[in-house]
Amino acid sequence: MEEAVRISKILSELGLCSRREADTYIEQGLVTLDGKVVTELGTRAYRSQKVELKKQAAIQQSSKVTVILNKPVGYISHLDDDKAFRPAASLIIQDNFQVSKQHSSRNPRFNTDGLAPAGRLDIDSSGLLVLTQDGRIAKTIIGEQSVIEKEYLVRVE
């Protein structure tokens, strides 16, 4: 017999959003189960049921920012609560922020709040770092089912 699972897990498995984002959408009343709005966190459903995001959730998702950054040595990938180290996200400022041609007509606000690294490079490493507000992108890059290959070049003295 099929087991009921949390709606947030179903939405994540469908690739519509991360579990955390799903919880936010549920709280905002932007998720439907068989056509009825769901607002209670932890609500369970069967995978055979129809779970959907409302259009307002898609609008929220389209405003999320993803940044590709060449992280230099001396910066950390994540935010530092102790303020002892400089986070790579601090390198992203209005003066060096560019919008892709595909999204230039949307006139996005410069907003880097909530950027999270999709992967990590330690303080002594440099290289490509993806910072995103979109859980779908993070899951695609570093999730358990990710097929994206990561390559590291290590130099030893």
Functional labels for PLM-detected ranges:
Residues 2-157:
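Basic, flexible Lys/Arg- and Gly-enriched helix-loop patches that mediate nucleic-acid binding at interfaces
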